[in-house]
Amino acid sequence: MIKKSTLALAAAVAYHSAPGFAAGTSGSGTITFSATVIEGPCSISAADSNMTIDLGQVSQRMLNGPGKFSDSVPVVIHLTGCSFDEDTGTTPNPNGKLSKVAVQFLGTFTNTQLGKISSTGTATAVAVQLLESDGTTPVNLAATPSAANAKQLINGSNELRYWARMSVVGGPGAVTSGTGSVQANATYALAYF
């Protein structure tokens, strides 16, 4: 009789302690949420706040020679929730106040006129070239944002489209590059007009 009571008690204890034991060994973690509240009339998509653009693994032969580049890869900044106040100025913008945006890129550049961003990787004489939305015109990295070079936005969602590719450092006469990694960084800042 004592054996049956002990067995029943042991089974009851095991049954009631199993969920606690299982929950303790299931794992846990921390979730950190971050965001920034900005003044601009548009929000920047969370996926575009800190982008990583993969330009691929490119043969050195593809880059060696004047005017040679890697294939271009799209770089898109998504603006969401754009909403503009009515423009009541002397020459009002029918789309509203601050409904134009210009992008300024900040960083270390090897050639601002040709849109070339310096690489800190191990590949020698290679830069990342940033192109306008047409895919051929280099972004002038020295340009100051102004209404003249700003893009007209609409209410709702908008895309700011650019292209990136690898290029040899220097101008059209630069012809050689070395193998290795390419790492380039630029920060973008939006200016509304």
Give, region by region, the residue ranges found by the protein language model.
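Mature extracellular/passenger domains of Gram-negative fimbrial/pilin and adhesin proteins
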Residues: 2-6, 15-16, 20-193
